[in-house]
Amino acid sequence: MTEAVQNVAQPQIEVENLNLWYGEKQALKNISMQIPKNSVTALIGPSGCGKSTFIRCLNRMNDLIKNCRIEGKVSIEDEDIYEKGVDVVELRKRVGMVFQKPNPFPMSIYDNIAYGPRIHGANKKDLGGIVEFALRSAALWNETSDRLKSTALSLSGGQQQRLCIARTLAVKPEIILFDEPCSALDPISTSRIEELIMNLKKDYTIVIVTHNMQQAARVSDYTGFFLMGELIEFGKTRQIFHNPKEQSTEDYITGRFG
């Protein structure tokens, strides 16, 4: 049973009756959700509950998995992203993704950021401005402006994760998916990423998967609780954490299981 927010202000992503199977195993069951524009939506739940599988449906990353089958509808700005003829490369430009562990390319800081724009045909003379914009947006410019030609692998873990965020921003997405972006970081780096996420929602719609419920409470406007492939409850974060409608939501948030 799902308590979902209906008719939210400016839904940018609408998911209707989404089901997903890996071979014979069903991993997502009848998920419906509206994700508002220019907001942070956190997805919480125990390991293996379907959170990461769900966000990979939003940019069709699950297409890369053998024997993965999807039914249902996922719309972004009223466009069904699973319709025939959808340009998946363009979709993944619109819907960027930041992964659990920082994954900088083995090249310079500059080339890490310029890589995506080059692929998408950016003019060479514009690349410098794009790189600066992305690094400033990811709060990394002041720490890297004097060493753009240095290898990205020389950055600290927290800096590498902000570099990955900058790399995503460089191709001008509309939506950014974060899959446990702070799980490999220390508390100071985590705090910087959280502050960055809250700043980015002015210009982007953000969906974050996290096992850290305190993080979900700090950064998100909306929260969805997943359990065994089902969306149990979805609503404004304050309501989910202070007055959940489902007993299993309350049990998870209060640490009775997880």
UniProtKB/Swiss-Prot annotation:
SUPFAM superfamilies tied to this protein: P-loop containing nucleoside triphosphate hydrolases
Gene3D superfamilies the record matches: P-loop containing nucleotide triphosphate hydrolases
Location of the protein in the cell: Cell membrane
Membrane topology: Peripheral membrane protein
Catalysed reactions, semicolon-separated: phosphate(out) + ATP + H2O = ADP + 2 phosphate(in) + H(+)
Residues of the ABC transporter domain: 13-253
Top EC category: translocase
Subunit record text: The complex is composed of two ATP-binding proteins (PstB), two transmembrane proteins (PstC and PstA) and a solute-binding protein (PstS).
Family recorded in the similarity comment: Belongs to the ABC transporter superfamily. Phosphate importer (TC 3.A.1.7) family.
Protein's name in the database: Phosphate import ATP-binding protein PstB
Species annotation: Methanosarcina acetivorans (strain ATCC 35395 / DSM 2834 / JCM 12185 / C2A)
